[in-house]
Amino acid sequence: TWSEQNIVQPLKTLMADDPDYSFDILEARYAIEASTAWHAAMRATPGEKEKIQLCFEATLSEDPDLASQADVRFHLAIAEASHNIVLLQTMRGFFDVLQSSVKHSRQRMYLVPPVFSQLTEQHQAVIDAIFVGDADGARKAMMAHLSFVHTTMKRFDEDQARHARITRLPGDHNEHSREKNA
């Protein structure tokens, strides 16, 4: 399709060359998902609200892989409930681009109990606002959620980079180095 060829593929190439582009996509998601949440609060049908709720409940899975997949479905269900095909297709494209690079980060977020708890509370706040038709509340809740995701992913990446630097240091940080220096 046109969007696959002209949007998704070039972004996938950028992501393959430099995974930090995922943060650029996350910034774009702020604008798009805030809008999908706003429109979903105004337009969601009872059936769409039920689908959003079911996707949310699936994010509570103890299996981090299933929970992270359900997280994607949750966000896409909100986009579907916005009744805006451009927003929905854009969201689908973003998740297609991010699928491989962010899957690991999503799984890590779901493995850390305090992070998992905060994600759950944030998702619930988005749902609550959508279900009562509070468009501004839904937009704000989604922006707060994505801000938290952005901060958490950056922290995980920084921790991973710090760990990689430490393991490359020579010296007495591990048993094998001490034995060689003795």
Predicted regions, residues:
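A short, mixed-charge helix-start or loop-turn motif at secondary-structure junctions
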Residues: 14-19, 59-60, 105-112
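Short linear motifs at protein or domain termini
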Residues: 1-32, 38, 42, 163, ...
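Hydrophobic/aromatic-rich alpha-helical bundle segments in the mid-to-C-terminal region
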Residues: 107-113, 135-139, 160-164
